Curated annotation (Swiss-Prot):
It comes from Synechococcus sp. (strain CC9902). It is a multi-pass membrane protein. F(1)F(0) ATP synthase produces ATP from ADP in the presence of a proton or sodium gradient. F-type ATPases consist of two structural domains, F(1) containing the extramembraneous catalytic core and F(0) containing the membrane proton channel, linked together by a central stalk and a peripheral stalk. During catalysis, ATP synthesis in the catalytic domain of F(1) is coupled via a rotary mechanism of the central stalk subunits to proton translocation. Key component of the F(0) channel; it plays a direct role in translocation across the membrane. A homomeric c-ring of between 10-14 subunits forms the central stalk rotor element with the F(1) delta and epsilon subunits. It is found in: Cellular thylakoid membrane. GO terms for cellular component: plasma membrane-derived thylakoid membrane; proton-transporting ATP synthase complex; proton-transporting two-sector ATPase complex, proton-transporting domain. SUPFAM superfamilies: F1F0 ATP synthase subunit C. Keywords: ATP synthesis, CF(0), Hydrogen ion transport, Ion transport, Lipid-binding, Membrane, Thylakoid, Transmembrane, Transmembrane helix, Transport. This is ATP synthase subunit c. F-type ATPases have 2 components, F(1) - the catalytic core - and F(0) - the membrane proton channel. F(1) has five subunits: alpha(3), beta(3), gamma(1), delta(1), epsilon(1). F(0) has four main subunits: a(1), b(1), b'(1) and c(10-14). The alpha and beta chains form an alternating ring which encloses part of the gamma chain. F(1) is attached to F(0) by a central stalk formed by the gamma and epsilon chains, while a peripheral stalk is formed by the delta, b and b' chains. The keyword tRNA-binding does not apply. NCBIfam families: ATP_synt_c (TIGR01260), PRK07354.1 (NF005608). The gene is atpE.
Length: 81
């Protein structure tokens, strides 16, 4: 792999992780804020709200993990060889 392709892979890997973390990070903050607000309004529903929140946070975090997998493939699997 030549140096330009190697440099482009490193830049693309950085962008993949960075951009894949922005959306879920904003979504997780919004969801957590909504959950805290919902628990403050209705404390007796805390268990149900917490369970739903944790499930949705796991789904959001999976998007970030997909970005990490793409970055690792770009760095170590050498798809351009």
């Amino acid at each position: 792999m030549d140096s330009i392709t190697s440099a482009a892979s490193v830049v693309a890997a950085g962008l993949a992780v960075g951009l894949a973390a922005i959306g879920p990070g904003i979504g997780q903050g919004t969801a957590s804020g909504g959950a805290v607000e919902g628990i403050a309004r209705q404390p007796e529903a805390e268990g149900k709200i917490r369970g739903t929140l944790l499930l949705s946070l796991a789904f959001m975090e999976s998007l970030t993990i997909y970005g990490l997998v793409v970055a690792l493939v770009l760095l170590f699997a050498n798809p351009f060889a």
